[in-house]
Regions:
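A helix-coil-helix interface module used to build multimeric assemblies
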Residues: 1-177
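Conserved small/polar residues in nucleotide/adenosyl-binding loops
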Residues: 178-184
Length: 184
């Protein structure tokens, strides 16, 4: 839907009616039709494009227009990774919170500290827990960095040359959007 909407805004022969039809049927997935088609063409993405076209007959000709299946699959993987990193981040924040409470609770409880795997001197359980917490905070910073800088792979057509899009746009200058970050 996003591709069709963008292509419409850029002046390709994509109508609002077609975009509306795609939008209205975005969750209307005929898995049986896609599975049957995949038996014939042995191509997962194009089988789903075909099945989507069955429920969106007015838009069938513009679904996936100029795109390559890797564009769909690879960018989907990036979105899945982003969502997974968000889950990890939420859980990590909870662990840090619990560990900070643990450190505060045991801040006065003495224990033996080690250096080079050898007993060294007294410290507290709370102090040791703050060191563990510090390591997790560095992991959290790394997750934040990765989420803030995660990028989609762009859409440069079948072989990365933009030839399919250049043809659609009649040789008009191609624009690279690979610098755009994925919304978090």
């Amino acid at each position: 839907v996003a591709l069709a909407r963008a292509e419409m805004k850029l002046g390709l022969n994509v109508t609002q009616e077609q975009v509306d039809e795609l939008e209205a049927n975005i969750d209307n997935i005929d898995y049986a039709a896609a599975a049957e088609r995949e038996k014939l063409v042995r191509h997962d993405v194009m089988s789903h494009v075909y099945a989507y076209g069955l429920v969106c007959p007015k838009a069938a000709g513009i679904i996936h227009l100029g795109a390559t299946s890797c564009y769909v699959g690879d960018n989907t993987d990036v979105i899945i990774m982003r969502d997974a990193l968000k889950v990890v981040k939420r859980k990590l924040v909870k662990v840090i919170d619990q560990l900070a409470k643990f450190a505060d609770k045991y801040k006065a409880m003495p224990c033996l500290a080690y250096t080079h795997l050898q007993p060294a001197q007294l410290t507290t359980v709370g102090k040791r827990a703050t060191l563990w917490c510090n390591e997790l905070l560095m992991d959290l910073e790394d997750l934040d960095f990765r989420l803030a800088n995660l990028k989609l792979l762009g859409s440069k057509g079948t072989t990365g040359t933009q030839a399919s899009f250049m043809e659609l746009f009649h040789g008009d200058t191609a624009v690279s959007y690979t610098h755009l970050t994925l919304p978090t």
